[in-house]
């Protein structure tokens, strides 16, 4: 079956990742020791997308866990599902990357990368027909960003025809963890533009807002944020794991969402978001789900889709519902908000339906949109980057690990190019495209 190999790196990646496994284990009825305790055959039908069945009938996640310090791994190991992972798949160093991208990418990370690749290879060989990789990491730190992007480029070399999907936590505008985040994030985006196929963009601030505003949590913890992320991650892949009427896989997703190869950074959303207490009292309808799913407040990254236009979007519904109703709602959204969709890609919203809803809900939906407004986020990081780089602040930490200033300049201009590409397609109209083709034709003559 079409397996997905999951890789988590750094503190953030390991925390999101372990939460994700809790959700997926729950959906497939697998207990913390890896035994199946579920009730429905559907849970087992495609369990091998994410799990390898060991000889004793236990299910072991196809997961590789890496970090440059042992701390987070220890807490994953002692966490609720810590015993389910294959012990050899924990790969960690002792030194830490100290929020330094260069340490993760060039020095400390480079020393550890071969051991990680060995584990990845071993897991990939266990697969019947590997579909691709999903990587969880943050871009603000050292390990997830530096070593994460190093691993992505190495995997790209070795498995060029497999999909590479990332769940990347971007530094958020107001909540800053370290002062060098803009450097780390810009250097990472430079890599992701070239080596990843699809990036799901998340950021803590947007997640805080959702917890605070929609879920009415007064003091949201990282656990709450990660819970939101894992709901989305599980939604993105539910089509692969459960039977449905309209299925999609990582590659179909990419084909439908990426009109130009570099523009593969997606906003994600999830519905229904209700506070934990009030969940059981209301029946959901497809129109309500659709309404909430397209709501700007529901997006998990700090960019406002109303400031740009959707190039493409994909909606994944879960639960028993009529496909006809889903299609009608989707057409309805596009007709009502036609100015927010580029007119030169007709029918640019794809929907899929999977029959099994997440635990505790009768239906749910996951939204993935390729919107030009995501440039706001790159712009923001880029401005912070430039402010520091102009003064060469903190650069010695990077050059000391053998990096060259040139690399910073390249990363900066790559990010700025990305922003202007988004802008170009935001402004493009169907007529302009035609004019442009005429010009080309004239030049060719």
From Swiss-Prot:
* Pfam families noted in UniProt: Tubulin, Tubulin_C
Q: Which family does it belong to?
A: Belongs to the tubulin family.
Q: Which SUPFAM superfamilies match?
A: Tubulin C-terminal domain-like, Tubulin nucleotide-binding domain-like
Positions binding Mg(2+) in this chain are: 69
- Region (Disordered): which ranges? 422-445
Task: Give one GO biological process term.
Answer: mitotic cell cycle
Provide the alphabetized UniProt keywords.
Cytoplasm, Cytoskeleton, GTP-binding, Magnesium, Metal-binding, Microtubule, Nucleotide-binding
* Keyword GTP-binding applies: yes
**Could you tell me what this protein is called?**
Tubulin beta-5 chain
Q: Any coiled-coil ranges, and where?
A: none
Provide the species name: Zea mays
